[in-house]
Swiss-Prot record:
EC number(s) on file: 4.2.3.5
EC category name: lyase
InterPro entries the record matches: Chorismate_synth, Chorismate_synth_AroC_sf, Chorismate_synthase_CS
The protein's annotated pathway: Metabolic intermediate biosynthesis; chorismate biosynthesis; chorismate from D-erythrose 4-phosphate and phosphoenolpyruvate: step 7/7
Keywords of the record: Amino-acid biosynthesis, Aromatic amino acid biosynthesis, FAD, Flavoprotein, FMN, Lyase, NADP
Biased composition (Basic and acidic residues): 40-49
Cofactor binding description: Reduced FMN (FMNH(2)).
Alphabetized CDD domains for the sequence: Chorismate_synthase
Protein name in UniProt: Chorismate synthase
Protein backbone atom coordinates (compact mmCIF):
# COMPACT_ATOMS: atom_id res chain seq x y z
CA UNK A 1 0.00 0.00 0.00
CA UNK A 2 2.83 2.40 0.81
CA UNK A 3 4.71 1.56 -2.38
CA UNK A 4 8.12 0.67 -0.93
CA UNK A 5 8.12 -3.01 -1.94
CA UNK A 6 8.70 -4.49 -5.40
CA UNK A 7 7.93 -8.05 -6.50
CA UNK A 8 5.61 -10.94 -5.64
CA UNK A 9 7.83 -13.94 -4.76
CA UNK A 10 11.21 -12.23 -4.89
CA UNK A 11 10.52 -9.02 -3.00
CA UNK A 12 12.65 -5.96 -2.32
CA UNK A 13 11.70 -3.37 0.28
CA UNK A 14 13.91 -0.29 0.50
CA UNK A 15 14.16 2.42 3.12
CA UNK A 16 16.15 5.57 3.76
CA UNK A 17 16.55 9.14 2.54
CA UNK A 18 19.18 11.08 0.65
CA UNK A 19 20.61 12.81 3.73
CA UNK A 20 19.51 10.32 6.38
CA UNK A 21 21.76 8.07 8.44
CA UNK A 22 21.70 5.21 5.97
CA UNK A 23 19.92 3.42 3.15
CA UNK A 24 18.68 -0.12 3.55
CA UNK A 25 16.83 -2.97 1.91
CA UNK A 26 15.20 -6.24 2.84
CA UNK A 27 15.38 -8.84 0.07
CA UNK A 28 13.01 -11.76 0.65
CA UNK A 29 12.33 -14.89 -1.37
CA UNK A 30 15.88 -15.60 -2.51
CA UNK A 31 16.40 -19.36 -2.86
CA UNK A 32 18.86 -20.92 -0.42
CA UNK A 33 22.30 -22.03 -1.51
CA UNK A 34 23.24 -19.08 -3.74
CA UNK A 35 26.91 -18.21 -3.24
CA UNK A 36 26.91 -14.58 -2.14
CA UNK A 37 29.25 -12.08 -0.53
CA UNK A 38 29.39 -8.31 -0.30
CA UNK A 39 31.84 -8.05 -3.20
CA UNK A 40 29.20 -9.50 -5.53
CA UNK A 41 27.01 -6.51 -4.76
CA UNK A 42 29.83 -3.99 -4.58
CA UNK A 43 30.79 -4.43 -8.23
CA UNK A 44 27.46 -3.06 -9.45
CA UNK A 45 27.31 -0.40 -6.73
CA UNK A 46 30.69 0.92 -7.84
CA UNK A 47 29.36 1.27 -11.39
CA UNK A 48 26.50 3.44 -10.10
CA UNK A 49 28.47 5.28 -7.39
CA UNK A 50 28.42 9.12 -7.47
CA UNK A 51 31.51 11.25 -7.86
CA UNK A 52 33.33 8.94 -10.26
CA UNK A 53 33.69 11.45 -13.12
CA UNK A 54 33.44 15.19 -13.74
CA UNK A 55 30.17 14.60 -15.59
CA UNK A 56 28.24 13.38 -12.54
CA UNK A 57 27.43 14.72 -9.09
CA UNK A 58 30.50 15.42 -6.99
CA UNK A 59 28.87 14.02 -3.87
CA UNK A 60 31.39 11.36 -2.90
CA UNK A 61 29.75 8.34 -1.32
CA UNK A 62 31.77 5.11 -1.07
CA UNK A 63 28.50 3.13 -1.06
CA UNK A 64 30.04 0.25 0.85
CA UNK A 65 27.29 -2.31 1.35
CA UNK A 66 26.95 -4.54 4.40
CA UNK A 67 25.04 -7.82 4.39
CA UNK A 68 23.31 -8.01 7.77
CA UNK A 69 21.37 -11.26 7.46
CA UNK A 70 20.29 -14.09 5.21
CA UNK A 71 23.80 -15.27 4.32
CA UNK A 72 25.74 -17.90 6.28
CA UNK A 73 29.13 -19.35 5.40
CA UNK A 74 29.04 -17.63 2.03
CA UNK A 75 25.65 -18.83 0.80
CA UNK A 76 22.08 -17.58 1.09
CA UNK A 77 19.93 -19.32 3.69
CA UNK A 78 16.52 -18.65 2.14
CA UNK A 79 15.69 -16.14 4.88
CA UNK A 80 15.39 -12.36 4.43
CA UNK A 81 18.63 -10.69 3.34
CA UNK A 82 19.24 -7.39 5.10
CA UNK A 83 21.40 -4.80 3.33
CA UNK A 84 22.73 -1.48 4.61
CA UNK A 85 24.70 1.42 3.10
CA UNK A 86 25.67 4.33 5.35
CA UNK A 87 25.49 7.89 4.03
CA UNK A 88 28.78 9.68 4.65
CA UNK A 89 28.91 12.82 2.48
CA UNK A 90 25.72 14.74 3.20
CA UNK A 91 25.76 18.54 2.91
CA UNK A 92 22.29 19.41 4.16
CA UNK A 93 23.15 23.12 4.51
CA UNK A 94 23.01 23.35 0.70
CA UNK A 95 19.23 22.96 0.97
CA UNK A 96 18.43 25.23 3.93
CA UNK A 97 17.28 28.10 1.69
CA UNK A 98 14.69 25.98 -0.12
CA UNK A 99 13.08 24.24 2.85
CA UNK A 100 9.95 26.38 2.34
CA UNK A 101 10.19 26.53 -1.46
CA UNK A 102 9.24 24.03 -4.13
CA UNK A 103 11.85 23.30 -6.77
CA UNK A 104 10.24 23.26 -10.23
CA UNK A 105 9.72 19.77 -11.72
CA UNK A 106 10.79 18.07 -8.48
CA UNK A 107 8.74 15.99 -6.07
CA UNK A 108 8.79 18.76 -3.41
CA UNK A 109 5.30 20.04 -4.23
CA UNK A 110 3.65 16.61 -4.55
CA UNK A 111 5.31 15.13 -1.44
CA UNK A 112 4.23 18.20 0.53
CA UNK A 113 0.60 17.82 -0.53
CA UNK A 114 0.53 14.03 -0.08
CA UNK A 115 2.21 13.74 3.33
CA UNK A 116 1.93 17.23 4.82
CA UNK A 117 5.63 17.05 5.64
CA UNK A 118 8.75 16.53 3.57
CA UNK A 119 12.44 16.00 4.05
CA UNK A 120 13.79 18.85 1.93
CA UNK A 121 17.44 17.75 2.28
CA UNK A 122 18.42 16.51 -1.15
CA UNK A 123 14.85 15.47 -1.88
CA UNK A 124 14.66 13.00 0.99
CA UNK A 125 12.97 9.78 -0.04
CA UNK A 126 12.30 11.05 -3.56
CA UNK A 127 16.03 11.31 -4.30
CA UNK A 128 17.71 8.90 -6.72
CA UNK A 129 20.04 8.10 -3.82
CA UNK A 130 17.48 5.41 -2.94
CA UNK A 131 18.37 3.51 -6.12
CA UNK A 132 21.65 2.38 -4.58
CA UNK A 133 19.63 -0.25 -2.72
CA UNK A 134 17.89 -1.34 -5.91
CA UNK A 135 21.30 -1.91 -7.49
CA UNK A 136 22.45 -3.92 -4.47
CA UNK A 137 19.30 -6.05 -4.51
CA UNK A 138 19.52 -6.41 -8.27
CA UNK A 139 23.02 -7.82 -7.90
CA UNK A 140 21.58 -10.68 -5.84
CA UNK A 141 19.04 -11.38 -8.57
CA UNK A 142 21.74 -11.22 -11.23
CA UNK A 143 23.86 -13.75 -9.34
CA UNK A 144 21.00 -16.26 -9.36
CA UNK A 145 19.96 -15.50 -12.94
CA UNK A 146 23.53 -16.03 -14.13
CA UNK A 147 23.40 -19.56 -12.71
CA UNK A 148 20.39 -20.13 -14.97
CA UNK A 149 22.16 -18.76 -18.04
CA UNK A 150 20.44 -15.36 -17.99
CA UNK A 151 22.57 -12.22 -18.44
CA UNK A 152 21.36 -8.63 -18.09
CA UNK A 153 23.33 -5.76 -19.65
CA UNK A 154 22.63 -2.15 -20.55
CA UNK A 155 24.13 0.85 -22.29
CA UNK A 156 23.45 4.49 -23.13
CA UNK A 157 21.83 4.76 -26.56
CA UNK A 158 21.26 8.53 -26.63
CA UNK A 159 22.58 11.57 -24.73
CA UNK A 160 20.52 14.67 -25.43
CA UNK A 161 20.45 15.07 -29.23
CA UNK A 162 23.33 12.61 -29.76
CA UNK A 163 22.30 9.14 -30.95
CA UNK A 164 24.67 6.34 -29.99
CA UNK A 165 24.71 3.22 -32.14
CA UNK A 166 25.54 -0.06 -30.47
CA UNK A 167 29.05 -1.24 -31.38
CA UNK A 168 30.45 -3.50 -28.67
CA UNK A 169 29.63 -4.63 -25.14
CA UNK A 170 33.31 -4.56 -24.19
CA UNK A 171 33.35 -0.75 -24.44
CA UNK A 172 30.41 -0.11 -22.10
CA UNK A 173 32.22 -0.39 -18.76
CA UNK A 174 35.36 1.40 -19.93
CA UNK A 175 33.88 4.92 -19.87
CA UNK A 176 31.66 6.96 -17.52
CA UNK A 177 28.81 7.18 -20.06
CA UNK A 178 28.30 3.41 -20.45
CA UNK A 179 28.71 4.18 -24.14
CA UNK A 180 29.03 1.17 -26.49
CA UNK A 181 30.79 3.18 -29.21
CA UNK A 182 34.30 4.42 -28.27
CA UNK A 183 34.35 6.74 -31.28
CA UNK A 184 31.48 8.75 -29.76
CA UNK A 185 33.27 9.58 -26.51
CA UNK A 186 34.95 12.85 -27.64
CA UNK A 187 31.58 14.18 -28.83
CA UNK A 188 29.88 13.20 -25.57
CA UNK A 189 32.66 14.76 -23.49
CA UNK A 190 32.50 18.03 -25.43
CA UNK A 191 28.72 18.16 -25.18
CA UNK A 192 28.76 17.67 -21.41
CA UNK A 193 31.49 20.27 -20.94
CA UNK A 194 29.42 22.83 -22.84
CA UNK A 195 26.33 21.85 -20.85
CA UNK A 196 28.15 22.59 -17.62
CA UNK A 197 29.25 25.99 -18.93
CA UNK A 198 25.62 26.68 -19.83
CA UNK A 199 24.58 25.70 -16.28
CA UNK A 200 21.96 23.42 -17.75
CA UNK A 201 21.01 19.74 -17.90
CA UNK A 202 19.93 17.18 -20.49
CA UNK A 203 18.09 13.86 -20.76
CA UNK A 204 19.20 10.45 -21.98
CA UNK A 205 18.02 7.14 -23.38
CA UNK A 206 19.15 3.82 -21.91
CA UNK A 207 18.80 0.40 -23.54
CA UNK A 208 18.70 -2.78 -21.44
CA UNK A 209 19.01 -6.30 -22.84
CA UNK A 210 18.62 -9.72 -21.21
CA UNK A 211 20.02 -12.75 -23.03
CA UNK A 212 19.27 -16.37 -22.18
CA UNK A 213 15.72 -15.70 -20.98
CA UNK A 214 13.72 -18.95 -21.22
CA UNK A 215 10.39 -19.22 -22.98
CA UNK A 216 7.41 -18.82 -20.65
CA UNK A 217 8.11 -16.01 -18.17
CA UNK A 218 5.15 -13.71 -17.62
CA UNK A 219 1.71 -14.05 -16.02
CA UNK A 220 -1.13 -12.90 -18.29
CA UNK A 221 -3.19 -10.94 -18.18
CA UNK A 222 -2.36 -8.31 -15.57
CA UNK A 223 1.20 -9.42 -14.75
CA UNK A 224 2.53 -9.70 -18.27
CA UNK A 225 6.31 -9.71 -18.37
CA UNK A 226 6.46 -6.52 -20.43
CA UNK A 227 3.88 -4.82 -18.19
CA UNK A 228 5.87 -5.60 -15.05
CA UNK A 229 9.12 -4.58 -16.75
CA UNK A 230 7.60 -1.26 -17.77
CA UNK A 231 6.39 -0.80 -14.18
CA UNK A 232 9.88 -1.55 -12.87
CA UNK A 233 11.65 0.83 -15.23
CA UNK A 234 9.07 3.60 -14.84
CA UNK A 235 9.66 3.49 -11.08
CA UNK A 236 13.21 4.78 -11.59
CA UNK A 237 13.64 8.49 -10.85
CA UNK A 238 13.36 10.79 -13.89
CA UNK A 239 12.10 8.08 -16.26
CA UNK A 240 9.32 9.48 -18.45
CA UNK A 241 8.96 6.76 -21.05
CA UNK A 242 9.58 3.04 -21.63
CA UNK A 243 9.58 1.04 -24.85
CA UNK A 244 9.67 -2.73 -25.27
CA UNK A 245 11.30 -3.86 -28.51
CA UNK A 246 10.57 -1.41 -31.32
CA UNK A 247 8.11 0.41 -29.07
CA UNK A 248 6.65 3.56 -30.63
CA UNK A 249 8.44 2.89 -33.91
CA UNK A 250 5.90 0.07 -34.37
CA UNK A 251 3.30 2.72 -35.22
CA UNK A 252 4.92 3.39 -38.60
CA UNK A 253 5.66 -0.27 -39.38
CA UNK A 254 3.40 -2.56 -41.36
CA UNK A 255 2.36 -5.96 -40.08
CA UNK A 256 4.41 -7.64 -42.78
CA UNK A 257 7.49 -5.93 -41.35
CA UNK A 258 6.75 -6.00 -37.63
CA UNK A 259 5.72 -9.63 -37.24
CA UNK A 260 8.59 -11.77 -36.04
CA UNK A 261 8.38 -14.68 -38.46
CA UNK A 262 9.60 -18.11 -37.43
CA UNK A 263 11.42 -20.91 -39.23
CA UNK A 264 12.67 -24.24 -37.88
CA UNK A 265 16.03 -22.49 -37.50
CA UNK A 266 14.63 -19.70 -35.35
CA UNK A 267 13.03 -16.25 -35.34
CA UNK A 268 13.81 -13.99 -38.29
CA UNK A 269 13.53 -10.75 -36.30
CA UNK A 270 12.84 -9.42 -32.80
CA UNK A 271 10.63 -6.36 -33.21
CA UNK A 272 8.59 -7.50 -30.20
CA UNK A 273 11.61 -7.27 -27.91
CA UNK A 274 11.43 -10.85 -26.67
CA UNK A 275 7.82 -10.80 -25.43
CA UNK A 276 4.73 -12.23 -27.15
CA UNK A 277 1.36 -12.04 -25.44
CA UNK A 278 3.05 -10.91 -22.25
CA UNK A 279 5.22 -14.06 -22.13
CA UNK A 280 8.93 -14.30 -22.92
CA UNK A 281 9.63 -15.87 -26.31
CA UNK A 282 13.19 -16.97 -25.60
CA UNK A 283 14.62 -14.16 -27.69
CA UNK A 284 16.63 -11.34 -26.10
CA UNK A 285 14.45 -9.18 -23.87
CA UNK A 286 14.96 -5.57 -24.99
CA UNK A 287 13.73 -2.39 -23.32
CA UNK A 288 14.49 1.30 -23.75
CA UNK A 289 13.88 4.04 -21.21
CA UNK A 290 13.87 7.81 -21.55
CA UNK A 291 15.08 10.00 -18.68
CA UNK A 292 14.19 13.66 -18.45
CA UNK A 293 16.73 16.44 -17.83
CA UNK A 294 16.95 17.24 -14.15
CA UNK A 295 15.61 20.60 -13.04
CA UNK A 296 18.38 20.85 -10.42
CA UNK A 297 20.32 23.53 -12.27
CA UNK A 298 21.82 26.82 -11.15
CA UNK A 299 19.68 28.90 -13.51
CA UNK A 300 16.93 30.68 -11.52
CA UNK A 301 13.46 29.21 -11.98
CA UNK A 302 9.99 30.49 -11.11
CA UNK A 303 8.01 28.64 -8.45
CA UNK A 304 6.00 29.14 -5.25
CA UNK A 305 6.66 28.67 -1.54
CA UNK A 306 4.59 26.80 1.05
CA UNK A 307 2.37 29.87 1.41
CA UNK A 308 1.62 29.98 -2.31
CA UNK A 309 3.70 33.11 -2.87
CA UNK A 310 5.79 33.55 -6.01
CA UNK A 311 9.50 32.89 -5.55
CA UNK A 312 12.59 32.48 -7.68
CA UNK A 313 14.43 29.24 -6.92
CA UNK A 314 18.15 28.75 -7.42
CA UNK A 315 19.13 25.15 -6.74
CA UNK A 316 22.32 24.64 -4.77
CA UNK A 317 23.96 21.34 -4.01
CA UNK A 318 25.78 18.71 -6.05
CA UNK A 319 23.73 17.33 -8.91
CA UNK A 320 24.08 15.25 -12.05
CA UNK A 321 23.84 17.43 -15.18
CA UNK A 322 22.53 14.27 -16.87
CA UNK A 323 20.93 11.74 -14.54
CA UNK A 324 20.98 9.23 -17.38
CA UNK A 325 24.75 8.85 -17.13
CA UNK A 326 24.44 6.74 -13.97
CA UNK A 327 21.10 5.15 -14.87
CA UNK A 328 22.41 2.10 -16.72
CA UNK A 329 23.22 0.00 -13.61
CA UNK A 330 19.86 0.99 -12.11
CA UNK A 331 17.95 -0.08 -15.22
CA UNK A 332 19.89 -3.35 -15.30
CA UNK A 333 18.97 -3.96 -11.66
CA UNK A 334 15.26 -3.37 -12.24
CA UNK A 335 15.21 -5.71 -15.24
CA UNK A 336 17.04 -8.34 -13.18
CA UNK A 337 14.58 -7.99 -10.29
CA UNK A 338 11.65 -8.36 -12.69
CA UNK A 339 13.13 -11.45 -14.32
CA UNK A 340 14.03 -12.99 -10.96
CA UNK A 341 10.50 -12.57 -9.66
CA UNK A 342 8.94 -14.00 -12.81
CA UNK A 343 11.43 -16.87 -12.95
CA UNK A 344 10.41 -17.98 -9.45
CA UNK A 345 6.71 -17.51 -10.21
CA UNK A 346 6.98 -19.54 -13.40
CA UNK A 347 8.92 -22.27 -11.62
CA UNK A 348 6.32 -22.44 -8.85
CA UNK A 349 3.36 -23.02 -11.20
CA UNK A 350 4.77 -24.41 -14.44
CA UNK A 351 7.94 -26.31 -13.55
CA UNK A 352 6.49 -29.62 -14.77
CA UNK A 353 5.11 -28.34 -18.08
CA UNK A 354 6.60 -30.13 -21.08
CA UNK A 355 5.92 -29.59 -24.79
CA UNK A 356 7.26 -31.41 -27.82
CA UNK A 357 7.78 -28.22 -29.81
CA UNK A 358 11.48 -27.29 -29.89
CA UNK A 359 12.64 -23.97 -28.52
CA UNK A 360 13.68 -21.59 -31.27
CA UNK A 361 17.06 -19.91 -31.13
Amino acid sequence: MSGNTFGKLFTVTTFGESHGEALGAIVDGCPPGVALEASDLQHDLDRRRPGTSRHTTQRREPDQVRILSGVFEGVTTGTPIGLLIENTDQRSKDYSKIKDQFRPAHADYTYHHKYGIRDYRGGGRSSARETAMRVAAGAIARKFLASQGIRVRGYMSQLGPIDIAFKQWEAVDTNPFFCPDPDKLPELEAFMDQLRRDQDSVGARITVVADGVPVGLGEPVFDRLDADLAHALMSINAVKGVEIGDGFASVAQRGSEHRDEMTPQGFLSNHAGGVLGGISSGQPLIAHLALKPTSSITQPGRSIDVHGEAVEVVTKGRHDPCVGIRATPIAEAMMALTLMDHYLRHRAQNADVEVSTPRLG
